[in-house]
Amino acid sequence: MNIIQQLEQEEIAKLNKTIPDFEPGDTVIVNVKVKEGERTRVQAYEGVCIGRSGSGLNENFTVRKISYGEGVERVFPIYSPMIDSIKVTRRGKVRRAKLYYLRDRRGKSARIAERAERGSDKGKAAPAAAE
């Protein structure tokens, strides 16, 4: 590890932020701090993560949602002080790192299949009842 990577790791450790493990295709809720005049409030922005870029302190992710029939994309720096929290609501099954093709799709064709978790009990049979 070179000096710059080491310094970045130290800065990330100082920030003390817990970032969930999410990938493109996952539906996330990003709670963003919005300053209006003197007061600050938290606004939820929910959408599909369509890509991640960068690394270390400079890592960004793009979230796309449909608002009033219009597609809206927003790029968030992961370690931004304006981000209050990130929550993953749904895991998506995709085969691409960048989901820019979703920009051209509407309705059912823009849906992303849900990814089954490896450690889940959904695929296992129910235990037999003891007699």
Swiss-Prot record:
Keywords linked to the UniProt accession: Ribonucleoprotein, Ribosomal protein
Cystine connections: none
Keyword Lyase annotated: no
One of the GO biological process terms: translation
Chain intervals for the UniProt region annotation (Disordered): 107-131
GO cellular component: cytosolic large ribosomal subunit
PROSITE patterns, sorted: RIBOSOMAL_L19
Biased segments, Basic and acidic residues type: 111-124
Transmembrane annotation, as ranges: none
GO MF assignments: structural constituent of ribosome
Keyword Membrane appears in the UniProt entry: no
Record function comment: This protein is located at the 30S-50S ribosomal subunit interface and may play a role in the structure and function of the aminoacyl-tRNA binding site.
Family note: Belongs to the bacterial ribosomal protein bL19 family.
Protein name (database record): Large ribosomal subunit protein bL19
Originating organism: Methylobacterium sp. (strain 4-46)
Phylogenetic lineage: Bacteria, Pseudomonadati, Pseudomonadota, Alphaproteobacteria, Hyphomicrobiales
Gene coding for it: rplS
